[in-house]
Regions:
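Extracellular/periplasmic, surface-exposed regions of secreted and cell-surface proteins
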Residues: 1-183
């Protein structure tokens, strides 16, 4: 089993239902890591309810477009799911006595990497909520760009080392796209 200790905080602010602001932060520590046990993962978002502005309320367009809210957010998430409970502490195997000259023996069954870190996914999202005819028809459009650094993966090793692989933070993954929701 493993242990995790986390703290989480959130601050939300809105001014007159027009300008929206949110800040979140998470601080995690986990026993699956050794030298880099703690991770800080913040996020921020802002939005603007354009339809709450007087210039919008007083215009003819507000009769057709009943909701208009551009928004943007950026956040960091952490992940350590690729690490076993004891990967950073070492694992040992037992050689059966009949295979080792009549005596039992212990051996390292895996290489240890105490420098493993949290995977970090950094996500930027830009979106627009728009509704027509008192929101009888509405769209939510989002563009996202996510980059994950320090991917937890096993790196193959040459056979003469006596081990097939070692767990490392190696690699980067980028995902991006557009999402459209129609209601």
């Amino acid at each position: 089993a493993y242990r995790i200790l986390s703290s989480f905080g959130r601050i939300n602010y809105n001014y007159d239902m027009k300008y929206l602001f949110s800040f979140v932060a998470r601080y995690d520590g986990i026993s699956r890591l050794k030298d880099n046990r703690w991770g800080f993962f913040p996020g921020i978002s802002v939005g603007w309810n354009v339809m709450e502005e007087n210039f919008w309320k007083d215009s003819k367009i507000s009769e057709v477009i009943s909701n208009l809210k551009p928004r943007i957010s950026y956040g960091v998430n952490g992940n350590v799911n690729g690490i076993g409970n004891f990967d950073v502490y070492g694992a040992y195997g037992l050689v059966d006595a009949k295979n080792y000259g009549g005596s039992s023996a212990f051996y390292n069954s895996a290489l240890v990497n105490t420098g493993l870190r949290w995977e970090q996914s950094k996500t930027l999202e830009v979106g627009l909520d728009i509704g027509f005819f008192n929101n009888k028809l509405s769209f939510i459009i989002d563009y996202f760009n996510r980059r994950t650094n320090d991917l937890l993966t096993k790196q193959a090793l040459p056979g003469y080392l006596g081990f097939s692989d070692i767990m490392t933070n190696m690699g980067t993954l980028r995902n991006s796209g557009i999402e459209l929701e129609v209601k």
